[in-house]
């Protein structure tokens, strides 16, 4: 089985490839997910959207334009059309012919490779419909041990938990709540994903003490260097939190960088 959500208490660390190894491969494709695992990741973060015919595809944007040779909203096209699109050539011509995967495709891959998936729901207008279909797919493929469900919308996460208590939920935060533990407990949240520029060791300590897993989202190393140029060297703090088992996961686009950090902690 993949690493548990609360990896730190087992002396482990989840290395999560954000949209797969998206620094070097076309994001949210099986190619990028496998590349992440090959580079040392044990988890991949993926994003879900609904097609016009209520099928779940793995894509980040509401529109097709940035990552495929298609155009328009994902919600305005049927699955058959989206599966015909090229999801690799815009990133690099070497990856021409890469396709947009479905949720089912990705779950089957995760089970075959024993890789954990951080599944982010990206469908604010049809969130309830997405949740229902997502849970049905997870039940059909018996994939509960391989996933946690994440979102910026913590009310949606509470609904996921109410409908399927076996699912673990991970709240994404871009702010710092006054009482982060109370806020997460109110939604029955199992884990929290925190941005580096809002990350404080004291919050991680409080969350771990409360039994809530902590995922730290890291920028690309060249962006992290901008903190250093501004007089803030954050690497010792990150390494210290990993070493002291205050962080269960590191997530980012550059799996090589995440691995380097984890090995130097």
Describe every region a protein language model picked out.
Residues 1-265:
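Phosphate-group recognition and catalysis centered on beta-loop-alpha active-site segments
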